[in-house]
Every structure is written in structure tokens, then in C-alpha cells.
A protein has these predicted regions:
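4′-phosphopantetheine-dependent carrier domains
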Residues: 1-304, 310-315, 322, 328-673
Length: 673
């Protein structure tokens, strides 16, 4: 009873909250507004709280702890309730752009606006426009590896200079800014990357600090002030293709980290106006005009967070269309070699097995990567029953007790030690399953951020790499105010630097990519509470897969998944309860594998979602039904606006029988009215 629920028993805080809710119901306890879960870390604390609320004594004597192994009960024949089958609402969605006028919603702010420098002169021009509106403005310039943070005056404007990758520098900047009445932050620094390619970057990436890290530090330093305001503005500005990278081929995807941060921060400070703005590159060549365009959008237009502005001024939003792949399945070939990060077990392994099953006897090779080292004895456990595994787990527990100075072992220590064995067994199962399909697999223990290690691996395979599947990732959800800088950095770099390291392996193998896929997340597409880092990393990879496809380098697809049921991160306690409470559908393993196999072998490309209902995450109703397909002859006829001027949308068609259309009449579209 005195063991820490999370640290020693492995019960996460979400599950603890559920337990306390049940306790309140069972003991009919009144609602206690002053109850703090972290003040009750053990069951003894829970018991004392119950007695206090019921009017009993507080002190509770803890019974002696008896260390006993888990016993496998003898099966007893008894009726087993049928499992509740979840309806599969998840499907494939293709991300496209849709014109978005936005709502006429001007805002007027009092205070000072912080603007990060862009390198094109837009930030200063924007500051002058802000001052014309009666506000004040300061600039923050990001310069990598400068020794000291500094501030000076430029034409009566305060300008700070700091290294965005130096948390101490950024803390000093924020300390100075907190002396002011900060009304908002406009992050234009990603525009510096509009004139540079990702290939120009270092490894580890220095560009990512310009787009994400400095922005995160400023938000963290100003978060409390933003929370106290009734209104305010937070925005990021990029220059990909005016459509957040959905069609262009010449842009630097690292810029998208800023968009990911903005989209997620929106869910933390919903009372602020937020905008992740992507400008067509031609628009930023005229600094004055670009500043006016940005100011007009930020101060005059409400609605969606993620907006693209094309060269002709049209506004675009990204939406998702229900769309199935219809091409024939093309199996892998004997000379295909895929390198697969995170491929030993879990979601990625299940997906790769699916591809292998649809490429029977192809002789393709899968190089599976993971951080875990294999435990040789687990190779013999592949066919073991649950009873055999439990027996071995109990013997491991006794080994840990014998090796412990205290003669005890906690549940967390036991499970952590066992995890090494279970993961190793999972890898051997994955390899065996792939080999049974007539393909080959090998496992390599290497950190995806170890660029040199991956280059060595690529050179040692003896086969040119033709495909990358990047499934590795970390997730550590915390609000900006409480998120650790080093955690933010690690979550992003596993995805972003990991991708670059995998490309290094391809190069050293002498291969040319035919196919690439990144496992991303719906949090990258829409943003999500507490996931600024995860969203930033996935936003970059989403855009990069679209860019690779558009450039013809290779066919590439980013699959943004919802949570998977019963595999990978989804096996954490209380996972399903959290998603159910948020109204988010999780995807079954079978459906997820089906979607990925289609992307890999049926021509999937650019950005795809594998999800169902996303609850409040879909804040702006981004999902669309599949567009109606018309016979070619009919489509060409009704496309002529002179013959059919009142056809905006075809709702239904029965060929050669009937056609139902929809039209919106407006003076703007029909001046004759």
C-alpha cells in the first residue's frame, strides 16, 4: 500500500484519476475542489483521504509487504462474455487544398507585438504597420551560435539578438519581454529558410532551431501573459508554395515546424487568434506588400488556423477527402531493400508484415532498425504459450530479487526488465513472419539519430536501399508552460534528424529511392493539446513527402495516423479511455495495415490520413466526402459555364436519367442579380 502508484506500480496518472472517480462513487464522497492527485501518490494516501472525507481517523497502518510470484491459475470452464466489437470508423483520407475566404473579423489589440526577424525586411515593415494601428512592436533576431544575448535600438525600435538553440539566451529575452504588455507574437524567422534547402543544413539540424526551438522558447516565456489576456495574437509565417507544401517541389520543409507549433498551441490558448500562414514564395520578394498581406490576414480575418496565400491572393485551407486507391497492387521486387526505423515490433512491424504478405516469394529484404538489443534466448520463445512466458517472467523476478541488495523488486523494475525480453521476442516473431512470406529480414540495433552508424549500416547491407519507412518516434505530451526544452528537442530530432540519417544510409548503400513513407500523426495535421513538439516534427515530414512526390525524386507518402488500438503506444494503460473521452476514433491493426499496404503497393502519395472521427481536434470541419465522379462526356459538357451557368456542385447523378446540382446565388458571383 505504500508503493508509489506511478513510480513503483506503473499506474499512470490518467488511470489514477479514473480510480479516484470510482472511489468517490463507491464511498459516496462529496466533490472536493481542493483535491490534488499528485498529493496522493500511494494507496495509503487514497485510504487516508477516504477516511478523512468520511470523518474517520487519518492514520492507516500499512500491512507487511509479502513478495510472492505471480501464479498462473488453472483454467476453469465458465461462460466468457463476448468481447465488445468496436465499429471501424477509420478510413483513408487524401489531404488536398480548398479555397477558404475566411470570416470578416477585425481585431484591435493594445500592447506590444513581438516579431521575429525574417531576413527579407518583412518583419520591420510589419512592425511599422502595427505601430500605425496604435500598437508597439519589438523584433527578435535569431542568430545561431552567437556568444551572448544582446539588445539594442534600431531607429527607435528595440531589437534582441539571441541563439534560438540556447535556452539561456531565450530565457533572457523573455525576461526582458515580460516587462512589457505583450499582446502577441508573430514568428517570421522561418522565412529565412525560404532561400535555403534542407540539404544545406547540418546534422544535427541547426535549421530546426530557427523554425521551432526559438519559437517554442518565446511561447513558453510569454505563456502566462497570454493566458491572462482576453485577446491576443500568435502567428507563424512560412513560404513553401502558398498551400503549405501540398503541390510545390522547391521549398524547405523544415519551415513547417513553426506551423506545427502554432496549430498545437491553438488548443492551449483558444481565446487568442492563431494563424499558421504560408505565403507563396513570390509574395515575400516585395517586403512592403508582403507585410500588408500578412497584416490584413492576421488583423482582419477570422476562422481557420492553417491558411495558405497563393500568388494571386487566394486563401487556401487544407482539407481531407474520403478517397480510396483504385490502382492494382504491385508487389515488391527481388531487388527491393527497405530500411525500416522502429520496424522490429508494434505498428510499423505490423505494417511491414502486411506488405510482405502482399509480396509473396518476392525475395525483397527488410532491414529493421531499433534501439533495443536482441536477447539470444528469446529466439527460442517465438512459439511459446502465455503460460510459458508467465513462468519465465516469474523466474526473472526471482533473479532480480536475488540480485537486489534489499531483497525486493518493484513492479516497475520487474516490468522494465521483462520488457527487454518481450521486445526481443517480438523482433524474432517479426523476422520469422516476414521470412515465411518468401522475403528476407534482418534486425540492426542502432539509434535512428546516429548518422554515422546508419551510414555504416547502409554500406554493410550489400544491397542498394530502394525504400525508407520511418516509423520511429517519441511522444511526451505536456503543455508549453511545463514542457522541458530537452524533451521538446528530442521529440523533434528523432523524427527530423532521424529522416536525414536514413537518407544517409540510402546514399552509402549506393541506392536510389523508389518509395518513401513516414508514419506521422493527426496531431501534425491538425495540432493537439500538449503536442507542440510532436506536431512540429510530423508537420515537417508531411510536407517533405509531398515535396518528394511533386519533384519526381520518388513516390513518397506521409500517413498521419490516429491512435492504433492494442499495439505500440496504444498498449499504455488508459489509452483507449483517453481517446474515447475526447471523441477520437482509434484504428484497428487490421485496418491500419490495410491502409498502409495500399499506400505502399497501390500508388499512394503526398499526405494521407488514417483515421475516423477526431472530436475537438477537428476544430474547423476539415473532412469531406469523396467527390462525385461523372462520366467523362457529361463532365466536359457541364463544365462549360456558358451552357450551364448555375452548376456549382453536382450532388447526384443517374446517367441518362437525372442530375441534381447545387448553386449558391450571390451578387459577387452573379453581378446581373
Amino acid at each position: 500500500l505504500d508503493q508509489d502508484l506511478e513510480g513503483e506500480l506503473g499506474i499512470d496518472t490518467v488511470k489514477q484519476a479514473e480510480i479516484m472517480a470510482d472511489v468517490r462513487d463507491i464511498f459516496e464522497l462529496p466533490i472536493d475542489e481542493e483535491f490534488v492527485l499528485s498529493d496522493h501518490p500511494t494507496l495509503n494516501h487514497f485510504t487516508a483521504y477516504i477516511q478523512r472525507m468520511k470523518g474517520g481517523a487519518v492514520a492507516v497502518e500499512a500491512p507487511p509487504v509479502v513478495e510472492t510470484p505471480v501464479v498462473v491459475p488453472t483454467p476453469v470452464a465458465s461462460p466468457v462474455p463476448a468481447p465488445v466489437e468496436r465499429q471501424e470508423n477509420c478510413r483513408r483520407w487524401q489531404v488536398e487544398v480548398e479555397e477558404c475566404v475566411g470570416s470578416d473579423s477585425p481585431i484591435s489589440l493594445d500592447g506590444t507585438l513581438v516579431v521575429t526577424d525574417d531576413g527579407w525586411g518583412i518583419a520591420e515593415a510589419f512592425c511599422k504597420l502595427v505601430e500605425a494601428k496604435g500598437m508597439k512592436a519589438v523584433r527578435v533576431g535569431f542568430e545561431s551560435e552567437i556568444r551572448d544575448m544582446s539588445s539594442h535600438e534600431e531607429d527607435d525600435r528595440t531589437v534582441f539578438r539571441a541563439d534560438p538553440a540556447n535556452p539561456e539566451h531565450m530565457a533572457e529575452v523573455c525576461k526582458e519581454l515580460r516587462q512589457l504588455d505583450i499582446a502577441g507574437l508573430v514568428h517570421m524567422a522561418p522565412l529565412k529558410l525560404a532561400g535555403a534547402t534542407w540539404n544545406d543544413d547540418t546534422l544535427p539540424s541547426s535549421q530546426i532551431a530557427l523554425a521551432a526551438h526559438g519559437y517554442f522558447s518565446l511561447l513558453q516565456g510569454l505563456d502566462a501573459q497570454f493566458a491572462e489576456r482576453e485577446d491576443g495574437l500568435v502567428a507563424s509565417v512560412t513560404a513553401l508554395d502558398g498551400r503549405h507544401g501540398n503541390i510545390g517541389e522547391r521549398f524547405n520543409s523544415v519551415q513547417c515546424a513553426a506551423s506545427g507549433v502554432t496549430k498545437s498551441y491553438f488548443f492551449e490558448q483558444t481565446h487568442l487568434r492563431m494563424r499558421a500562414l504560408d505565403m507563396h514564395p513570390e509574395l515575400i520578394l516585395d517586403a512592403e506588400q508582403a507585410a500588408q498581406t500578412i497584416a490584413a490576414d492576421l488583423f482582419e480575418t477570422g476562422g481557420e488556423v492553417e491558411i495558405g496565400i497563393d500568388r494571386d491572393g487566394r486563401r487556401w485551407a487544407l482539407v481531407a477527402f474520403a478517397e480510396d486507391l483504385e490502382a492494382e497492387t504491385t508487389p515488391l521486387q527481388s531487388d527491393d531493400t527497405w530500411i525500416v526505423s522502429g520496424g522490429g515490433s508494434g505498428v510499423t512491424a505490423a505494417s511491414i508484415i502486411g506488405v510482405a504478405c502482399h509480396s509473396l516469394n518476392a525475395g525483397a529484404h527488410f532491414a529493421l532498425l531499433g534501439r533495443s538489443s536482441l536477447v539470444e534466448e528469446t529466439k527460442e520463445w517465438v512459439e511459446w504459450s502465455d503460460a510459458q512466458l508467465t513462468e519465465r517472467k516469474n523466474s526473472l523476478r526471482q533473479e532480480l530479487i536475488d540480485a537486489s541488495d534489499s531483497g525486493k523488486v518493484t513492479m516497475v523494475q520487474w516490468n522494465s526488465a521483462w520488457q527487454k525480453f518481450s521486445r526481443s521476442r517480438d523482433v524474432y516473431i517479426t523476422i520469422k513472419t516476414i521470412e515465411e512470406t518468401g522475403n528476407d529480414a534482418s534486425y540492426h540495433s542502432v539509434d535512428v539519430m546516429d548518422a554515422d552508424g546508419l551510414r555504416d549500416l547502409g554500406a554493410s547491407l550489400g544491397r542498394p536501399i530502394t525504400g525508407i519507412i520511418h516509423g520511429a518516434g517519441l511522444e511526451d505530451s505536456k503543455l508549453v508552460a511545463s514542457k522541458d526544452y530537452n524533451v521538446f528537442d528530442k521529440v523533434i530530432r528523432v523524427k527530423v534528424d532521424g529522416w536525414q540519417s536514413l537518407l544517409g544510409a540510402v546514399e552509402s548503400s549506393g541506392g536510389e529511392l523508389r518509395f518513401a513513407s513516414c508514419f506521422t500523426s493527426v496531431s501534425g495535421r491538425f495540432g493537439n493539446n500538449g503536442q507542440t513538439d510532436y506536431s512540429a516534427a510530423n508537420s515537417i515530414l508531411d510536407a517533405e513527402m509531398a515535396r518528394l512526390t511533386a519533384s519526381g525524386t520518388c513516390r513518397a507518402v506521409a500517413v498521419a495516423w490516429t491512435g492504433w488500438r492494442d499495439v505500440g503506444m496504444a498498449t499504455r494503460g488508459s489509452f483507449q479511455a483517453v481517446f474515447d473521452a475526447a471523441g477520437i476514433d482509434t484504428i484497428s491493426v487490421d485496418k491500419g495495415v490495410e491502409i498502409f499496404v495500399g499506400e505502399a503497393l497501390q500508388g499512394g502519395k503526398r499526405r494521407v490520413l488514417g483515421c475516423g472521427n477526431l472530436g475537438t481536434m477537428d476544430a474547423f470541419d476539415a473532412f469531406r466526402e469523396a467527390p462525385l465522379r461523372l462520366p467523362a462526356e457529361m463532365a466536359s459538357v457541364i463544365a462549360d459555364p456558358y451552357r450551364f451557368p448555375f452548376v456549382d456542385k453536382v450532388l447526384s447523378v443517374d446517367e441518362r436519367q437525372s442530375l441534381v446540382t447545387q448553386t449558391t446565388l450571390s451578387v459577387a458571383d452573379h453581378p446581373f442579380l
